[in-house]
Swiss-Prot record:
This is Carboxypeptidase Y homolog A. Vacuolar carboxypeptidase involved in degradation of small peptides. Digests preferentially peptides containing an aliphatic or hydrophobic residue in P1' position, as well as methionine, leucine or phenylalanine in P1 position of ester substrate. InterPro entries: AB_hydrolase_fold (IPR029058), Peptidase_S10 (IPR001563), Propeptide_carboxypepY (IPR008442), Ser_caboxypep_ser_AS (IPR018202). Residues 20-39 are annotated as: Disordered. Its EC number is 3.4.16.5. Residues 1-18 form the signal peptide.
Length: 550
């Protein structure tokens, strides 16, 4: 990748109902001024301005980075994120518009006569615009589909989503929110590349996917944070916590419009940097007592969740201890071993003082020292078995998806408002990195999740960047009441009847006290891409309640 560190690709959505508005065509809108590029303050200027507050701790850490990566400052520049060009569609083009202010104004009495809002949360600034997508127009799937935007009117943020109803039993099957990672990669990548109802071939044509996860669940694919995929804003989001408020608002307004889906079980799934997103997003939902989001579990695939436990396993995975031949020579492996103690010390400082001033140096040093040697080989960081080809994200199919999603008739059918689509926005990737989000200990939220819902961590075992060794390690190290019994639980075979009608072992699983870890054989970072049948098998089993203890 042509950035400081590897961007994690995801790697890594429904009928009429209440609060439906009768829409009238507005007068012709006035021309919108050309959006101005958004200049994000140089994070290193911010460091210098306030460094004295953390001099003893952060000063030593930063000196360490400068000693070991002396050219790092010359490679850093203030970030200028160009505002996306867009054309706002008139309200008359949308099938439904749900106003957060209408929902926030609803009060009810509880059993004791105490009045409270029907739905918790600050929703007044949000609207949800929804378009019914004609399935015959794009030929992606025959099921009912909706697309649209969540508008944060107070902050000029507009998040795009695309919903597909279940192919099986829409009013009985669960609903899943799918999130790709990056940070900065579109969830439509996961939709077309991994687990959605269709893939895009070299002729830029949609092909039916028999192993789509909407075989037995309805799915919302969400482009977040803002300025990812079809989403847009004049503002920037640079941390996971800020993004959580928007996701809660979208789900709340979506299930308000489509009550028939709100009664179903709801799950959040994602991969890669979604290992950061999902613990925060799930915690935000569970924080509210009065909600219409029936959250039942979360699924994280090949995620980055606990860097302190995961970073020690870059060297083993690259050097032949992860089940595949070594990618690096002995000198490079030794160099990674030598760098590890300093890296872990820096991550520990980030965990102790969660700030840009401690977390950013850890990201810079550790990613250069432990990911950099592998990156220089030209091997695919998402699959140790292959070389990186096609583009910076190593898969030529991603170019097909981008070309398809930039077709005017596709954008028109979906009600898209931006002028163009890109699969990953590396400015967002760097923005999250420069604000210290990368190394923060979001795994600390998982124990409180486990007290209420099951958590699945799965990992394709050929991935380097968020490898199965590190994911297994952090789940076994997690401090929660079931820690000891989970850590000592044996790995057991995962089996399925394959396409030849034979019983096949496709992975291993261990589970206790609501926490489950799966290793999926012969799959890389994007597990459903490499192992579509096995992925659908374990997803269906999980969503049906297998391994759940709450």
């Amino acid at each position: 990748m042509k950035s400081l560190v590897l961007g994690l690709l995801v790697g890594s959505a429904i009928a009429s109902g209440p609060l439906q508005h009768v829409l009238h065509a507005p007068p012709d809108p006035e021309p919108k001024p050309e959006p101005e590029p958004q200049v994000v303050k140089d994070p290193f200027e911010e460091l210098r301005d306030t460094f004295d507050r953390l001099r003893n701790k952060a000063g030593d850490i930063w000196d360490d980075v400068m000693d070991n990566i002396p050219n790092i400052m010359s490679n850093m520049r203030p970030l200028t994120i160009p505002a996306k060009k867009f054309t706002r569609r008139p309200d008359s083009e949308w099938t439904h518009i749900v106003r957060g202010a209408d929902l926030e104004a609803l009060w009810v009495d509880d059993e004791s006569g105490y009045k409270h809002r029907k739905i918790d949360g600050k929703l007044a600034q949000y609207d949800l615009r929804i378009k019914a997508v004609d399935p015959s127009d794009l030929g992606i799937d025959k099921v009912k589909q909706y697309s649209g935007y969540l508008d944060d009117n107070a902050n000029d943020k507009h998040l795009f989503f695309w919903f597909f109803e279940s192919r099986n039993d829409p009013f009985g099957d669960p609903v899943v929110l799918w999130l790709n990672g990056g940070p900065g990669c579109s969830s439509l990548t996961g939709m077309f590349f991994e687990l959605g109802p269709a893939s895009i071939d070299e002729n830029i044509t949609a092909n039916y996917n028999p192993y789509s996860w909407n075989s037995n669940s309805s799915i919302i694919f969400l482009d977040q944070p803002v300025n990812v995929g079809y989403s847009y804003s004049s503002q920037a989001v640079s941390d996971t916590v800020t993004a959580a408020k928007d996701v809660y608002a979208l789900l709340t307004l979506f299930f308000t419009q489509f009550r028939q889906y709100s009664a179903q079980d709801f799950h959040i799934a994602g991969e890669s940097y979604a290992g950061h997103y999902i613990p925060v997003f799930a915690s935000e939902i569970l924080h509210h007592n009065n909600t219409n989001i029936n959250l039942q579990s979360v699924l994280i695939g090949n995620g980055l969740t606990d860097p302190l436990s995961q970073y020690p396993f870059y060297r083993p995975m690259a050097c032949g201890d992860g089940g595949y031949p070594s990618v690096l020579d002995s000198q490079s492996c030794q160099s990674m071993d030598n760098a590890l103690p300093r890296c872990l010390s820096m991550i520990k400082s980030c965990y102790d003082i969660e700030s840009t001033f401690t977390c950013l140096p850890a990201s810079i040093y550790c990613n250069n020292a432990l990911i950099g040697p592998y990156q220089k080989t030209g091997r695919n960081p998402y699959d140790v078995r292959t070389n990186c080809t096609g583009n910076d994200l190593c898969y030529p199919q991603l170019n097909y998806i981008t070309e398809y999603l930039n077709k005017p008739h596709v954008m028109r059918s979906l009600g898209v408002e931006v002028d163009s689509y890109e699969s990953c926005n590396m400015d967002i990737n760097r923005n999250f990195l420069f604000h210290g989000d990368w190394m923060k200990p979001y795994h600390r939220l998982v124990p409180s999740l486990l007290a209420r819902i099951p958590v699945l961590i799965y990992a394709g075992d050929a991935d380097f960047i968020c490898n199965w060794l590190g994911n297994k390690a952090w789940t076994e190290a997690l401090e929660y009441p079931g820690h000891a019994k989970f850590a000592e639980a044996p790995m057991e075979n995962l089996t399925m009847i394959n396409s030849q009608g034979k019983n096949e072992v496709f992975g291993e699983v261990k589970s206790h006290s609501n926490l489950t870890f799966m290793r999926i054989f012969k799959a890389g970072h994007m597990t459903p891409f490499d192992s579509p049948q096995a992925s659908l098998e374990f997803a269906n089993s999980w969503l049906s309640g297998e391994w759940s203890e709450v």
